[in-house]
Amino acid sequence: KCIVHGAGGTLLQHLKEHLLHTDLHRDDRLFYFTTCGWMMWNWLVSGLASGATLVLYDGSPTHPDPEALWRLAGEERITVFGTSPRYLAGLAKAGARPRDRIALPALRTILSTGSPLAAESFDYVYDAVKADVQLCSISGGTDIVACFALGNPLLPVRRGELQCAGLGMA
């Protein structure tokens, strides 16, 4: 899509989403499996304004095996991990259980966007990845390079649901 965005308003929007909706701060390590052609790249890079450290990955998310990104998360002490519903569903289908082999003590939030996150994927994450993590299904748009609905660290996570509308977006 050939869309031009301004920098100032986008950065302010992302700061709101990072600081208030994701509880991102200076000591965090933010990762989102994305290409620089997807709006999530802009969202990821804006994490620098919160003082977070970015973790980048170039390559297949399932090479040399389906748990490659979770090993990265453990080794790099990622605190906020972003991915897609398709990736999580693929892991479940492959029978991957990162929880059994990979320590993820720093991980506190998993974000998922790109399509709706199925209720079964919530079950999979809490059973096979990490039980004490905030799983946020988020929804936004390339045209606004922001989120319409996303997580809230003050609200409970409900299987198959988005937690809340973005502040100022309803």
Go through the PLM ranges and name each one:
Residues K1-I3, H18:
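Conserved adenylation A10 loop of the ANL superfamily
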Residues T34:
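Active-site beta-alpha turn of Rossmann-fold NAD(P)-dependent dehydrogenases/reductases
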Residues R86-A89:
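Alpha-helix/helix-capping structural signal
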Residues A49-A52, T79-G82, A92-R159:
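Gly/Ser/Thr-rich phosphate-binding loop
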Residues R159-G166:
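Short Gly/Pro-enriched turn/cap motifs at secondary-structure boundaries
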Residues V4-G8:
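Conserved AMP-binding/adenylate-forming core of the ANL superfamily
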Residues G9-R29, M39-T79, A94:
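Conserved AMP-binding/adenylation subdomain of ANL enzymes
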